[in-house]
Design a protein with these regions (language model features):
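Conserved acidic donor-binding segment of nucleotide-sugar-dependent glycosyltransferases
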Residues: 117-118, 122-129, 138-143
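Short hydrophobic beta-strand element within catalytic cores of glycosyltransferases
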Residues: 93, 98, 102-105, 115
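Nucleotide-activated donor-binding/catalytic signature segment of Leloir-type glycosyltransferases, i.e.
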Residues: 42-64, 74
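A short, well-ordered alpha-helix in the C-terminal region of glycosyltransferases
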Residues: 26, 131, 144-158, 167-170
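Acidic donor-binding loop of glycosyltransferase active sites
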Residues: 70-85, 101
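A structural motif in glycosyltransferase catalytic domains
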Residues: 13-16, 29, 132, 168
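Nucleotide-sugar-dependent
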Residues: 80-94, 112-113
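A conserved mid-protein helix/loop that constitutes part of the nucleotide-sugar donor-binding site
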Residues: 3-22, 36-43, 130
Length: 175
């Protein structure tokens, strides 16, 4: 669930997926979004022979997006710094966590605000194909994503409007 741009790092995820499909032939990567890199990413899917593993959705309802998240095991967005663009707070990771979906995020940007490494997901070096691959493989192996997803769900509960309002009130009373 993200825009298709260089910062989101779909290319490296696809390269890791190419290797993972040898071990896990039923693996599927669901892409929800649009953006300037969409055609390049679709072309890379063909080049890497991943058409059977990658599904694309865009302009879908919130209900369908939420249903796809709920059926997912892992949310992966190992963002990188691209030019001067850095990932902000990882709201997409929190959305996934609400459905007990563990996440893999990049060490650059806001993923670490939403993911507790080795507790609710994994933080990896998005510039390293090996790190992305090993993070995915580690979660898939022995279905580790189930435990991390359960923890992610618990963490996501603190990111609701009531808690956010209370945090703002605390800040404002200090001013």
């Amino acid at each position: 669930v993200s825009r298709f741009d260089k910062r989101k790092n779909h290319e490296k995820v696809l390269m890791a997926l190419r290797n993972l499909k040898q071990i896990y032939p039923d693996i599927v990567y669901i892409c929800i979004g649009y953006g300037e890199e969409e055609n390049n990413i679709k072309e890379l899917v063909k080049e890497l022979d991943l058409s059977g593993q990658v599904m694309f959705f865009k302009d879908i309802s919130d209900d369908l997006k939420n249903a796809l998240l709920a059926k997912s095991n892992i949310f992966v967005m190992p963002s990188i710094v691209h030019k001067t663009s850095v990932e902000g707070f990882g709201i997409a990771f929190i959305e996934a966590a609400q459905y007990s979906v563990a996440s893999i995020g990049g060490k650059d940007g806001g993923a670490s605000d939403a993911i507790q490494h080795d507790k609710t997901g994994m933080i990896c070096d998005g510039n390293s194909l090996e790190d992305i691959y090993s993070s995915l493989e580690s979660m898939i192996k022995n279905k580790r994503y189930l435990e991390l997803g359960k923890n992610a769900k618990a963490l996501s509960l603190k990111f609701n409007w009531s808690n956010t309002i209370e945090e703002y009130k605390k800040i404002l009373t200090k001013i």
